[in-house]
């Protein structure tokens, strides 16, 4: 348990209104307590860690100066919002983040009135905040709207689309965008000149001159004097920082400012609150600030399991091979014999298992940053020239490049292999990161071949099969580990569109897809039912399905995808096209966005673990229950 006597100031803060009761001179002490509390609480529970440590001062400054929740803060991605949650009535629950029934890992509108926009994917904040600012302007509402976006999220085109729109509007919306630059990707250093410039561009004097000039000379580009003054200011600032881009897009740029210097932050924000039109504040922060180990390993401490802050993360010993590990090994093995192979990732080198490949084949590795649309069309272009690109991407992020998959890859039947990680139920990261829809939205695309492995060995074979197939292919595999079937070192392929009969039985045929083959087989063998590892969602094994339809009374399809339009729907469509009338029971994920919990709990909740499949069968066919087949035997 956390001893709140160690946090005398933080213990007095339940809402931002309580924070505003402190004197400015006390905020440094509040920040120190908040940072230490974050370290202690996340150490107990696990969760996103380093990003939140980097925005402690910024979060305090925003809630201190802005009248939240009337003024609206829109956070991008959400990894950095633990301090925000702590200051907005959720301090005592922060250790429940990512746990079933606990706080969401990202901002969630249903959770708090201070969470103005739900998020989990990157680069949405400016668009959402602009929408809010436009409505406020139309309603004559003086509320302030602030978007907080990291420099990583600024690699996505959507952010620039929003900046371009906001900066070109007339009348101009009152919108503040805060660029949280924690990787020095925009400014290489915060030296003396840039510090001086940050103070100057954020000063009342310069802004008074600028605003006075607008009133005297006008703000139109056709006014020669105003145009000259604007160009002079841009030239002066452009010598020191890359502000010209934002200024050209119609934003008044302030910064860069040290994001851990509370007086500097407060001073700049006080000035910016008085200005009209689109504003951009550039702050420099350190991810993991205040915890030396996190500052030194920002990737390793991005998201953590529970740990002792006094000792830091302890490297795990030998662990069971994950599906991501299988992909990682296959990719390097295939690259060794196939010079055409090129690998692409949208900023997920570690998560998608590309670290080893990037080290062994740096000239064949392409990290395009958070740019899923570009990643897929880049792969399409490579394929037109005879290369075989492999796009390693999470299922949830593939949604962002769906048009490119359809229009640029599938329509042209280009040889692109999609290694779709985190398919199906994902777990603690919640609805924003779930892969519950991919079988549905991939199955309907013409020319697309789609596979889902039942185990690790099959995953490797499917990747090889997809690599050698002529046309677009997706191999969709889950987060975490599988049954433990060790893959061979060979690069064997599977016959396309051929399922695997796992067990011959009577009456009922259980058709399992991907991870659902294991519970289907566990239950089917116990009850004497036929069990099939379908392997292919598209094309389905037509020959086997027609044979089973002639010899069985009913089909039961089992998949970790929403039932609507999923793999089971494909089976029903095939039988319908053949004029076969046969009862089909579809077991899968619900028509709902599942919330955060462990994968095991979510699979059980959906009724597609072994116990759930068993219960579903007995509810429809009670005669299957015999003394030797108790529910507890398969739970």
Swiss-Prot record:
GO terms for molecular function: 1-deoxy-D-xylulose-5-phosphate synthase activity; magnesium ion binding; thiamine pyrophosphate binding. Binds 1 Mg(2+) ion per subunit. It holds the Pfam family Transket_pyr. Keywords: Isoprene biosynthesis, Magnesium, Metal-binding, Thiamine biosynthesis, Thiamine pyrophosphate, Transferase. Pathway: Metabolic intermediate biosynthesis; 1-deoxy-D-xylulose 5-phosphate biosynthesis; 1-deoxy-D-xylulose 5-phosphate from D-glyceraldehyde 3-phosphate and pyruvate: step 1/1. PROSITE patterns: TRANSKETOLASE_1, TRANSKETOLASE_2. Catalyzes the acyloin condensation reaction between C atoms 2 and 3 of pyruvate and glyceraldehyde 3-phosphate to yield 1-deoxy-D-xylulose-5-phosphate (DXP). Belongs to the transketolase family. DXPS subfamily. This is 1-deoxy-D-xylulose-5-phosphate synthase.
């Amino acid at each position: 348990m956390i001893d709140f006597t160690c946090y005398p100031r933080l213990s007095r803060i339940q809402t931002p209104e309580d924070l505003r009761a402190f004197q400015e001179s006390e905020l440094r002490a509040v920040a120190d307590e908040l940072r230490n509390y974050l370290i202690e609480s996340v150490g107990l529970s696990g969760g996103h860690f380093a990003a939140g440590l980097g925005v402690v001062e910024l979060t305090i400054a925003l809630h201190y100066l802005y009248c939240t929740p009337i003024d609206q803060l829109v956070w991008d991605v959400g990894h950095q919002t633990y301090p925000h949650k702590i200051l907005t009535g959720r301090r005592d629950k922060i250790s429940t983040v990512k746990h079933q029934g606990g706080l969401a890992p990202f901002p969630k509108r249903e959770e708090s009135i201070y969470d103005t926009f739900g998020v989990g994917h990157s680069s949405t904040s400016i668009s959402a905040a602009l929408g809010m600012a436009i409505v406020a302007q139309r309603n004559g509402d003086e509320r302030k709207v602030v978007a907080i976006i990291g420099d990583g999220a600024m690699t996505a085109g959507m952010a620039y689309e929003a900046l371009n729109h906001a900066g070109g509007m007339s009348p101009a919306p009152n919108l503040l965008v805060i660029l949280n630059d924690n990787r020095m990707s925009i400014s290489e250093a915060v030296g003396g000149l840039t510090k001086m410039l940050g103070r100057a561009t954020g000063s009342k004097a310069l802004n008074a001159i600028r605003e006075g000039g607008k009133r005297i000379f006008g703000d139109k580009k056709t006014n020669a004097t105003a145009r000259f003054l604007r160009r002079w200011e841009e030239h002066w600032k452009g010598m020191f920082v890359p502000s010209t881009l934002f200024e050209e897009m119609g934003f008044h740029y302030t910064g860069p400012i040290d994001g851990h210097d509370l007086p500097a932050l407060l001073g700049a924000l006080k000035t910016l609150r008085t200005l009209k039109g689109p504003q951009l504040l550039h702050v420099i922060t350190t991810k993991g600030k205040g915890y030396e180990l996190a500052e030194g390993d920002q990737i390793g401490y991005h998201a953590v399991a529970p740990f002792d802050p006094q000792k830091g993360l302890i490297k795990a010993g030998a662990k069971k091979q994950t599906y991501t590990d299988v992909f990682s090994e296959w990719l390097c093995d295939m690259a060794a014999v196939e010079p055409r192979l090129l690998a692409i990732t949208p900023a997920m080198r570690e998560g998608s298992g590309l670290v080893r490949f990037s080290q062994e084949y740096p000239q064949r590795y392409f990290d395009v940053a958070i740019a899923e649309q570009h990643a897929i069309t880049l792969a399409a272009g490579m394929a037109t020239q005879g290369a075989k690109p492999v796009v390693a991407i999470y299922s949830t992020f593939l949604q962002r490049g769906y048009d490119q998959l359809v229009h640029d890859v599938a329509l042209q039947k280009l040889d692109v292999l999609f290694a779709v990680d985190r398919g199906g139920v994902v777990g603690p990261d919640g609805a924003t990161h779930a892969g519950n829809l991919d079988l549905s939205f991939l199955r309907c695309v013409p020319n697309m071949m789609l596979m889902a492995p039942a185990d690790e060995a099959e995953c490797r074979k499917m990747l090889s099969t997809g690599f050698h197939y002529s046309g677009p292919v997706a191999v969709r595999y889950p987060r975490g580990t599988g049954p433990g079937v060790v893959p061979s070192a060979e690069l064997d392929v599977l016959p396309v569109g051929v399922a695997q009969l796992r067990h011959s039985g009577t009456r009922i045929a259980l058709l399992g897809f991907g991870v659902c083959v294991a519970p289907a087989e566990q239950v089917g063998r116990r009850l004497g039912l036929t069990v099939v590892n379908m392997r292919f969602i598209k094309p389905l094994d037509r020959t086997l399905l027609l044979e089973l339809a002639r010899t069985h009374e009913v089909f039961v399809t089992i998949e970790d995808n929403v039932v609507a339009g999923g793999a089971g729907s494909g089976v029903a469509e095939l039988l319908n096209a053949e004029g076969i009338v046969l009862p089909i029971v579809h077991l899968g994920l619900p028509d709902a966005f599942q919330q955060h919990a462990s994968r095991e709990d979510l699979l059980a909740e959906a009724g597609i673990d072994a116990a759930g499949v068993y219960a579903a069968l007995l509810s429809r066919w009670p005669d299957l229950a015999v003394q030797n087949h108790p529910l507890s035997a398969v739970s």
